[in-house]
Regions:
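Active-site helix of classical SDR
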Residues: 114, 151, 159
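C-terminal substrate-recognition "lid" of short-chain dehydrogenase/reductases
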Residues: 111, 209-238, 243
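Alpha-helical segment proximal to the catalytic Tyr-Lys
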Residues: 119, 164-168, 229
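Substrate-binding pocket helix/loop in short-chain dehydrogenase/reductase
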Residues: 90-91, 95-103, 197, 201
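Residue(s) in the substrate-gating loop at a strand-loop-helix junction
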Residues: 134
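Active-site loop-to-helix junction immediately N-terminal to the catalytic Tyr of the SDR YXXXK motif
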Residues: 94, 140-149, 161, 189
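Short, flexible catalytic-loop segment of classical short-chain dehydrogenase/reductase
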Residues: 178-188, 225
Length: 244
């Protein structure tokens, strides 16, 4: 621990597993107090029992719940938006319901949390917002990621807009664009692809391995810390060379 986030208060969505959880753990190790949320409350228990974070169930698609949670938590210095869903398919496999759900969870959830927490961040003199986007859709089109890619491109645009609107008021807003990261949800998709599914994902990687959630969390710590004080409105690519 180097206490790069000492004295800072952070709020993390989708913290029960994968990238969100890794970020919550990394923030705590760097000295931040962490309020971790997820729709799966049971999966948050170890974060609380290990003294890593205060936890609460939160459906990031529920505006009233987001607002109530923000009121309960109060002012934060760091907002990490990690909630998201990967829809598999082309435009022909994407129903109106699929489209609406993907945008609601992947984009509008960030709109909700930013609207809920930004006023107190402004009152407190500033803060850092970090949104999890993706290499897919922002830097490169990926097969069968039609609506997923569209939502992540929207996240990058949302990020730049927030950064531009509040740059003179102490708010920094950046997004992280991971490549293929080994998380529980990614392993579920690999299993659904059948035997050799994980190996198929690995074969697409120039570095011949998958990324780790901890590698994404390390970048999130940097963006949350004062070390990145001159950085805002940027989509940070961390993909093991996938887009080369």
């Amino acid at each position: 621990m180097s206490n790069r986030l000492k004295g800072k208060r952070s709020f993390v969505t989708a913290a029960a597993a994968g990238i969100g959880r890794a970020c919550a753990v990394a923030f705590a190790r760097e000295g931040a107090s962490v309020f971790a949320t997820d729709i799966d409350e049971n999966a948050l228990i170890t974060l609380k029992s290990e003294g890593i974070a205060e936890v609460a169930r939160l459906d990031a698609r529920d505006t009233a719940a987001v607002n109530a949670t923000a009121k309960r938590v109060g002012k934060v210095d760091i907002l990490l938006n990690a909630a998201g869903f990967v829809h598999h398919g082309t435009v022909l496999q994407c129903s109106d319901e699929d489209f609406d759900f993907s945008f609601d969870l992947n984009v509008k959830s960030m709109h909700r949390t930013i609207r809920a927490f930004l006023p107190s961040m402004l009152e407190g003199g500033g803060g850092s917002i970090v949104n999890i986007a993706s290499a897919a859709g922002v830097f490169k089109a990926a097969p069968n990621r039609y609506v997923y890619g569209a939502t992540k491109a929207a996240v990058a645009a949302l990020t730049r807009s927030v950064a531009a609107d509040f740059i003179t008021r102490g708010i920094r807003c950046n997004c992280i664009c991971p490549g293929t990261i080994e998380t529980p949800s990614m392993l579920q998709r690999a299993a659904a692809a059948g035997p050799g599914g994980r190996e198929m994902f690995v074969s697409r990687q120039p570095m011949e391995r998958l990324g780790t959630a901890q590698e994404i969390a390390a970048l999130a710590v940097y963006l949350a810390s004062d070390e990145s004080a001159f950085t805002t409105g940027v989509a940070h690519l961390i993909d093991g060379g996938w887009t080369l």
